[in-house]
Amino acid sequence: MNYTVKKAWKSLHFIMRILRKGNSNTKRLAYTSLVRPILEYGAACWDPYREGQIRELDRVQKKAAKFSHHTKSPTWETLASRRKIARLCALYKAYGGERAWKAIGDRLERPHYLSRADHNLKIRNRRQRTDIGKYSFVNRTIEHWNQLPAEVLGTLPCKPNTLKKRVNKVIHVASSKMC
């Protein structure tokens, strides 16, 4: 975690030195192509759950937004929502039996009981005693998967990009209602 944040800061400071007089689109493009991939590499699986770690990652993006747009409130999608979408897409690939995710997909189980309000693609969450187990990739993602509305998952199987667009729409509608 510390290595990733340090590497992202180095890349961001490099961009800030080189593009000091560049326009905002160039700065944004440099951030999204050079810094964001560092912050998101493998983020679907190692998504941090502690507030301090999440704040460290968000500080890098806020600094880049301030540098790019000269404002404190960026209109960019938050890193947390991007990681959540990536986790849900990865679980979809495991649920669909994609070869790279087969080890996880083989261990997914349907719940013993479904209420009428639940969708039929619900996955049973595993009980864990430790924080490492509770907040692991699989358990956190299953919790979010089960909270998705039936319309998003209703027409599976579909392409991962289609699912990503649907989930993105649901997450952004939910976040706009909270504001």
Regions of interest found by a model, annotated:
Residues 1-179:
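Hydrophobic/basic alpha-helical segments
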